[in-house]
């Protein structure tokens, strides 16, 4: 391995790590970005680690070493950075072990199973002066960059209202994600941390949440088509939340994952002069046809300098995972601890989600700042106790 290459270990070789490899590391490598080398694959499931190592060897030319746990990984001298994709309840223990060993860390969202655990991760990163990047890919896609640009350009006027509704049905069992003590919460956290990040990215900071939650149908099936091997989920399946933004805007956020038959997928930001539908484009008062998302994206890309375009979309890659991986590698090599979605940014987005859970638990409005400061932990307390997060 060349001295200039960043030696990276992959911890957790399941589904989402496959996306990190196939949508991130591999296309960068194939574009000629050879500033890194994957040197280890780590998983308690050795077969998964071996399979991913074989896949990487096919395009990298060298096969990563396979290890069964992080302790064995940290005994290796040749690792500079670690990409961690594991169940939420393991984030803080594995990330902190790597950070304390002086390794840079790219950590899949959410930051941690609770904010108290997340704070411990932040403290370890600061203490050891290493890069901590949260794998938040949604905001990096061209459509989201274009939407933010259009809002900042004043195309919809002053943002005033947000309507974010995801209503659908999932009946199949999703493993650890269906258990609150392992996941920290349901789709309001797992997908919701993406959505909270996008709302903050487009509209601004969220300061207060009023929410309610329910579990209407906890039944899942390992064999969903046959209705065989039932499992009882312990996560919420329905969340309704009212949001108040720092700039005066208000929002409605709905997540429902067991609503039968009729789906609702609405993500719209209204301003004083128009609206942006995150799926359909820009709608303006007095104009019959919307500006399509493709047209908006083309306008945004045309507005960029060559340097800005290369910074946002290195090697012309438009995939958000490729961009976050590239940024992480460059930050580690340059000794620059600044990345777009660092631990603090990840903490802020997760705090919005946790404010929803806390408000629903307490049945009253909750200030996000108090949740961030760990002054409100009624929902999170049993999870902290389960994992002895103090």
How does the language model describe each region?
Residues 1-59:
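N-terminal Rossmann-like dinucleotide-binding module
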Residues 63-70:
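Conserved SAM-binding strand-loop segment of SAM-dependent methyltransferases
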Residues 2, 81, 87-139, 154:
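Beta-strand-loop-alpha-helix segment that lines the small-molecule cofactor/substrate pocket
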Residues 197-290, 322-338, 353-356, 369-390:
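Contiguous beta-strand/loop segments that form the cofactor/metal-binding neighborhood of enzyme cores
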């Amino acid at each position: 391995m060349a001295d200039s290459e960043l030696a990276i270990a992959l911890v957790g070789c399941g589904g989402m790590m496959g996306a990190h490899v196939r949508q991130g590391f591999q296309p960068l490598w194939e574009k000629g970005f050879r500033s890194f080398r994957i040197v280890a694959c780590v998983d308690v499931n050795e077969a998964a680690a071996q399979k991913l190592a074989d896949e990487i060897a096919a395009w990298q030319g060298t096969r990563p070493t396979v290890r069964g746990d992080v302790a064995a990984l940290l005994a290796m001298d040749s690792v500079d950075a670690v990409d961690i994709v594991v169940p939420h309840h393991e984030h803080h223990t594995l990330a902190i072990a790597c950070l304390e060993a002086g390794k840079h860390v790219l950590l899949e969202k959410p930051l941690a199973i609770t904010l108290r655990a997340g704070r411990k991760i932040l403290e370890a990163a600061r203490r050891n002066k290493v890069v901590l990047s949260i794998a938040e890919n949604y905001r990096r896609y061209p459509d989201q960059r274009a939407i933010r640009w259009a809002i900042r350009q004043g195309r919809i006027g002053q943002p005033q209202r947000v309507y974010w509704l995801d209503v659908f049905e999932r009946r199949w069992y999703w493993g650890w994600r269906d258990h609150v003590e392992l996941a920290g919460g349901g789709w309001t956290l797992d997908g919701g941390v993406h959505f909270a990040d996008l709302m903050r990215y487009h509209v601004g900071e969220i300061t207060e949440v009023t929410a309610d939650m329910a579990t209407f149908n906890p039944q899942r099936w390992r064999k969903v088509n046959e209705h065989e091997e039932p499992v009882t989920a312990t996560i919420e399946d329905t969340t309704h939340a009212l949001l108040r933004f720092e700039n005066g805007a208000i929002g409605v956020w709905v997540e429902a994952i067991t609503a039968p038959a009729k789906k609702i997928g609405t993500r719209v930001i209204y301003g004083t002069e128009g609206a942006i539908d995150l799926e359909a484009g820009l709608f303006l008062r007095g104009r019959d046809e919307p500006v399509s998302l493709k047209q908006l994206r083309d306008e945004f890309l045309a507005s960029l300098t060559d340097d800005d375009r290369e910074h946002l979309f290195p090697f012309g890659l438009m995939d958000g995972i490729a961009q976050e991986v590239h940024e992480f590698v460059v930050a580690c090599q340059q000794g620059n601890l600044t990345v777009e979605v660092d631990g603090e940014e990840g903490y802020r987005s997760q705090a919005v989600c946790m404010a929803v859970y806390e408000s629903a638990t307490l049945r009253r409005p909750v200030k996000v700042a108090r949740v961030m400061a760990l002054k409100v932990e009624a929902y999170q307390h049993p999870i902290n106790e389960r994992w002895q997060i103090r």
